[in-house]
């Protein structure tokens, strides 16, 4: 994972041999840590959980927050293709679901 991507993605239990990557988008006001227990639960099933860490949350408190979902999507769209050819999916809760949906649409364009 590149330096730019590593700020955005928190991987609590890296699995280089995982069969699937699940990108998890937190609800508004939350950070990547809300999905850390998922990483342990999915590990036995060959799934690597990558939690999205937005600016101005948890370990990124000094980073300026982004003002819109479009800005978040624009920042993330180029970071997902990092040489990882395994299948992946998105999960988002509340605002995170909207970000995940808009990111999926942006990747199709």
Residue ranges and their predicted role:
Residues 1-109:
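Domain-scale detector for complete catalytic domains at protein termini or as standalone homologs
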């Amino acid at each position: 994972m590149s330096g730019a991507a590593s700020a955005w993605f928190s991987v609590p239990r890296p699995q280089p041999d995982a069969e699937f990557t699940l990108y998890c988008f937190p609800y508004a006001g939350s950070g990547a840590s809300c999905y850390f227990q998922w990483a342990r639960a999915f590990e036995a099933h060959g799934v690597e959980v990558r939690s999205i860490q937005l600016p101005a949350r948890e370990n990124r408190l000094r980073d300026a927050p982004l003002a819109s979902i479009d800005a978040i999507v624009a920042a993330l769209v180029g970071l997902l293709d990092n040489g990882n050819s395994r299948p992946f999916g998105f999960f988002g809760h509340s605002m995170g679901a909207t970000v995940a949906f808009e990111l999926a649409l942006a990747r199709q364009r």
